[in-house]
Amino acid sequence: GIAEFLNYIKSKA
């Protein structure tokens, strides 16, 4: 989901 997508990017940051 979108929330998971944002969480993925934040995890990489």
Swiss-Prot record:
Its main location: secreted. One of its GO terms (biological process) is defense response. Transmembrane segments: none annotated. Keywords: Amidation, Amphibian defense peptide, Secreted. The keyword Secreted applies. Coiled coil: none annotated. This is Signiferin-3.1.
